[in-house]
A protein has these predicted regions:
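Conserved class I S-adenosyl-L-methionine
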Residues: 141-171
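A short glycine-rich, Lys/Arg-flanked "PGG" loop and its adjoining helix->strand segment in the class I
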Residues: 125-140
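Class I SAM-dependent methyltransferase SAM/SAH-binding core
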Residues: 44-102
C-alpha cells in the first residue's frame, strides 16, 4: 500500500544517487556506541546458520564476527566499499530509487538488514513489498537509524519529520506492505551527561518486524 505522496518523495538533490556515491567513503557515519549496540541487537536476533542480506550497505555491516552465518549478501551503490566489507560472501550494486526489484529468489533470505538507509528511499513501499517476497517464512527485517543523514539526499518525508515521526513513518510502511507489527527499540544517552553536547551519543532507533 502506498504511504507517501509525491511531495514527500522529493528531495533537495534529485541528481542520480549513483553519482553522489561514486567515490568510496571509508568512514563511520554512526558513532561507536551506536555500532556496538547494533551489533548486540544482531547477536540476539540473528540465529546461527542464517542467510542474511545487508541492503544499502558499506564497508562494515556491524555483524558480530563470532556468529556463524550460512551466507551474507551485500548490496550498495559503491563497489569499492562493498569489496572492503570482509563479512560479505557476495554483493551487487543497484539504485533502489530507480529500481525496487531485488534480484534474489523468493523466500531465500532469513534476515534483511538496513542501517542508516531507509531515510534515502523515495519508493519505500515497493522495496518493502519486495523484501517481504525474498524473506523466508517468519523472516525478519531489522531497520536501524539515528539522527544523521546526507540531508540533501533524503526525501521530504524524512527531513521534515521529528525523530518520533520517522519511527511512525517506517512502522506504517512495514505494516502496510507485508510485515507484522514491529518491535521498536529506542536508546538514548544518559541525560546526566548532556551538559557537554559534543559528548552526546548518537540516538539509536531500530524496528524489527517479522514477515506476515
Amino acid at each position: 500500500m502506498e504511504v507517501l505522496n509525491n511531495y514527500q518523495r522529493q528531495k533537495i538533490d534529485e541528481s542520480n544517487d549513483e553519482d553522489f556515491y561514486s567515490s568510496p567513503k571509508f568512514v563511520y557515519h554512526l558513532d561507536a556506541n551506536f555500532r556496538t549496540y547494533l551489533s548486540s541487537v544482531y547477536k540476539n536476533e540473528i540465529k546461527d546458520n542464517s542467510t542474511v542480506v545487508d541492503l544499502m550497505s558499506s564497508w562494515d555491516s556491524y555483524l558480530p564476527l563470532e556468529k556463524k552465518y550460512k551466507q551474507v549478501i551485500g548490496h550498495g551503490l559503491n563497489k569499492d566499499e562493498l569489496e572492503k566489507n570482509k563479512i560479505l560472501d557476495s554483493f551487487w550494486n543497484q539504485n533502489f530509487n530507480l529500481n525496487q526489484k531485488i534480484p534474489l529468489d523468493s523466500s531465500s533470505i532469513d534476515y534483511c538488514l538496513m542501517v542508516a538507509a531507509f531515510q534515502y528511499l523515495q519508493y519505500p513501499e515497493d522495496l518493502t513489498r519486495d523484501i517481504a517476497r525474498i524473506l523466508s517464512d517468519k523472516g525478519k527485517i531489522i531497520i536501524s537509524f539515528s539522527n544523521r543523514a546526507f540531508w540533501h539526499k533524503a526525501p521530504n518525508i524524512w527531513t521534515s519529520s521529528t525523530e518520533e515521526e520517522r519511527l511512525t513513518y517506517v512502522r506504517k510502511v512495514l505494516i502496510s506492505n507485508g510485515f507484522e507489527e514491529p518491535r521498536i527499540i529506542r536508546k538514548f544517552n544518559d541525560i546526566s551527561f548532556n551538559f557537554l553536547p559534543f559528548l552526546k551519543n548518537d540516538p539509536f532507533y531500530c524496528l524489527i518486524a517479522t514477515k506476515e
